Amino acid sequence: MLEGIVRESTGKKATKALRRDGYLIANIYGKDFPNIHAAFKKGDFIRTVRHKEKLAFPVKVGDKELEVVVQEYQKDPVTYDLLHVDLMVAQPGVVTYYMVPIKTVGTPIGLKNKGVLVTSKRRIKVKGAIENIPDSITLDVSNLDVGDAILIRDIELPEGVEHMTAPHVAVVGVVKAK
């Protein structure tokens, strides 16, 4: 379980001091839930997020244990270091928006015809309760030829979950290599 600290001071000086000590600044929030200003060790946070198996993962901040979902993050424009992360509390039964990762399996037949697999969306926005949201969406790209694409409307979601992205948007496709 990822453990963090509660930040007492939320000012610029305190934030810079925490970042200098290797902490990642985080805000934890939810519907009818008080905001928590927290900080996590950057290495521990990245390791936890990379190796998590579910969309929601447990964190312990102060004396509270919460299931949270990464809602948004901010990176430094030059060094690409993680600066800030917004974590939303995954409350059962509460319908809200989530970003679900896309995974592809298979080798497209279009690669043999001088095509290149292009992933347009790595995550798609969906709406539903956390218990209905899939941990990831797996797309089989083995039937894609040059010029073919998988659109949002082609992706099947579980009952109680709906797309929040326009149905004509391409997620993955095979284009002709130049």
From Swiss-Prot:
InterPro entries in UniProt: Rbsml_bL25/Gln-tRNA_synth_N, Ribosomal_bL25/Gln-tRNA_synth, Ribosomal_bL25_b-dom, Ribosomal_bL25_C, Ribosomal_bL25_long, Ribosomal_L25_dom, Ribosomal_uL5_bac-type
GO cellular component: cytosolic large ribosomal subunit
CDD domains: Ribosomal_L25_TL5_CTC
Biological processes per GO annotation: translation
Top-rank taxon: Bacteria
Oligomeric form and interacting partners: Part of the 50S ribosomal subunit; part of the 5S rRNA/L5/L18/L25 subcomplex. Contacts the 5S rRNA. Binds to the 5S rRNA independently of L5 and L18.
Chain's role: This is one of the proteins that binds to the 5S RNA in the ribosome where it forms part of the central protuberance.
Similarity field: Belongs to the bacterial ribosomal protein bL25 family. CTC subfamily.
This protein's name: Large ribosomal subunit protein bL25
Source organism per UniProt: Nitratiruptor sp. (strain SB155-2)
Gene responsible for this protein: rplY
